[in-house]
């Protein structure tokens, strides 16, 4: 089994990527610049959705780098930063089992050094206007900043992210294009439980019974997608989705969005919307142990 090299600082991860490139270049008689690096950024507590990204990265690259970093700047004050699930030991085993080359495991002080008076952030301005951005002020500034930093550190050929976080996908594609970062952003299909519930580290907050209840989210979205032509206008469509979801008294819908899959902005003036638009939502599930925020998306 391939050794997983764990790097907990920036200098080390850069050195290890460089060493791997030289090694592969010599072994396979390839030019250094031809060596492809696949990168999967995560916040840890890995599940089969994350692993599917790593497996695809392995198929398409010479070197696979995964990062685990619970990024504090993308959490608001009332969110779950302090309680976000973590199991580095198990994550490392999973990554080793699928043949990951390098694991970048920085601390907040490494990514946001306080002693230097850290004050630089990346803002994709359009993301403040999307529904998820309005619902979580400052979230996308945190996402854009950490992803930019990770890309500058790892300089990957390809970056792999899951479609479930649709607005993050749009944000990252925009920043890579606008900042002329030489990385391909590859969006991978959402991985779901057999029940339809989208895989998420936050599902660990829910009991088995609550996860079954949460699986109704995807089923309701699919049902409305299949019946969209029976509605005459956008607002009645959204209202009915909200109404059906909130038949479960433990669900409180934050928003239902019909948006462009390119900009993330709401499609107001066309219904039914163009093919491949995003139908997404966020809701609060008032579960027994804690309030849990769930998101999901399907492509229309």
From Swiss-Prot:
Its predominant location is cytoplasm
Pathway named in the protein's UniProt entry: Cofactor biosynthesis; (R)-pantothenate biosynthesis; (R)-pantothenate from (R)-pantoate and beta-alanine: step 1/1
GO terms of molecular function = ATP binding; pantoate-beta-alanine ligase activity
Keyword Nucleotide-binding belongs to the record:
yes
Pfam families recorded for this chain? Pantoate_ligase
UniProt keywords (A-Z) are: ATP-binding, Cytoplasm, Ligase, Nucleotide-binding, Pantothenate biosynthesis
Catalytic activity as recorded in UniProt: (R)-pantoate + beta-alanine + ATP = (R)-pantothenate + AMP + diphosphate + H(+)
Q: Which Gene Ontology cellular component annotation is one that this UniProt entry carries?
A: cytosol
| Compartments reported by the entry | Cytoplasm
Q: SUPFAM superfamilies in the record, alphabetically? A: Nucleotidylyl transferase
What EC number(s) has UniProt assigned to this enzyme?
Answer: 6.3.2.1
Using the UniProt record, name the top-level EC class of this enzyme in a single word: ligase
The active site annotation covers: 50
Coiled-coil residue spans: none
**Which processes are annotated in GO (biological process)?**
pantothenate biosynthetic process
Q: Tell me, what does this protein do in biology? A: Catalyzes the condensation of pantoate with beta-alanine in an ATP-dependent reaction via a pantoyl-adenylate intermediate.
Q: In which family does this protein belong, per the annotation?
A: Belongs to the pantothenate synthetase family.
Subunit field text:
Homodimer.
More details:
The reaction proceeds by a bi uni uni bi ping pong mechanism.
Xref: NCBIfam families: cyt_tran_rel (TIGR00125), panC (TIGR00018)
Q: What is this protein called?
A: Pantoate--beta-alanine ligase
Gene name on record?
panC
